[in-house]
């Protein structure tokens, strides 16, 4: 990742701390991966406190595939099968079947309905019957071990939520340009600035976790 582009957001460790502060304040974070990987930026928000306005922003400026990052334990709790048995996607992204809240939604498409679905899936004591399948929210199962196991946006989202003190569940969506192309780092950074989001890279988070876990041991 081009460090010059990111320099205004501080050092790698400062960027992680600023991202955690942003999440705790209810703001979004732009998570960038490497140019050699997907080369994309994902908007992420805490699933517990994401607002309808933030969901609307995500739908308006994102790919349209609004994802809920969850752990394997939560996937089992909700009895969500993986979308396919044999995952042949380039990065092994862990999609489960799609979901809709069983109550409190109309068609499930609106920003408010998608927030309702997210809340239904992550509430304490959530049961499989709280969700209909299929739906308009795409759960993503994170790998155990987070970014130290798999350097994906899914794992980064779970790691950031956990470090910020939230339940391990977050909403993500890839940022797109107005012409429908994928936003790359310069566009992602500009968008984050316009919408008061912190910016962090997966590489930053890997280094941060490694350093802190070394200290702890």
Swiss-Prot record:
Q: What is its EC number?
A: 4.1.99.12
User: InterPro entries annotated for this entry?
Assistant: DHBP_synth_RibB-like_a/b_dom, DHBP_synthase_RibB
Alphabetically sorted, this entry's keywords are: Lyase, Magnesium, Manganese, Metal-binding, Riboflavin biosynthesis
Q: A Pfam family in this protein? A: DHBP_synthase
Q: Does the keyword tRNA-binding apply?
A: no
Q: Which reaction does it catalyse?
A: D-ribulose 5-phosphate = (2S)-2-hydroxy-3-oxobutyl phosphate + formate + H(+)
Ligand binding (Mg(2+) 1): 38
Gene Ontology cellular-component terms for this entry are: cytosol
Needs which cofactor?
A: Mg(2+); Mn(2+)
Q: Could you tell me the Gene Ontology terms of the biological process aspect for this record?
A: riboflavin biosynthetic process
Binding residues for D-ribulose 5-phosphate, per the UniProt record? 37-38, 42, 150-154, 174
Enzyme category, top tier = lyase
Give the metabolic or biological pathway.
Cofactor biosynthesis; riboflavin biosynthesis; 2-hydroxy-3-oxobutyl phosphate from D-ribulose 5-phosphate: step 1/1
Write out the residues that bind Mg(2+) 2: 38, 153
Keyword Lyase among UniProt keywords: yes
Residues at the site labelled Essential for catalytic activity: 136, 174
Q: How is the cofactor bound?
A: Binds 2 divalent metal cations per subunit. Magnesium or manganese.
Q: What GO terms are given for molecular function? A: 3,4-dihydroxy-2-butanone-4-phosphate synthase activity; magnesium ion binding; manganese ion binding
**Family the UniProt entry places it in:** Belongs to the DHBP synthase family.
- Please name the PANTHER family in this protein's record: 3,4-DIHYDROXY-2-BUTANONE 4-PHOSPHATE SYNTHASE, GTP CYCLOHYDROLASE II-RELATED
Q: How does this protein assemble?
A: Homodimer.
Query: What role does this protein play?
Result: Catalyzes the conversion of D-ribulose 5-phosphate to formate and 3,4-dihydroxy-2-butanone 4-phosphate.
Name the chain's protein: 3,4-dihydroxy-2-butanone 4-phosphate synthase
Q: Which organism is it from?
A: Salmonella paratyphi A (strain AKU_12601)
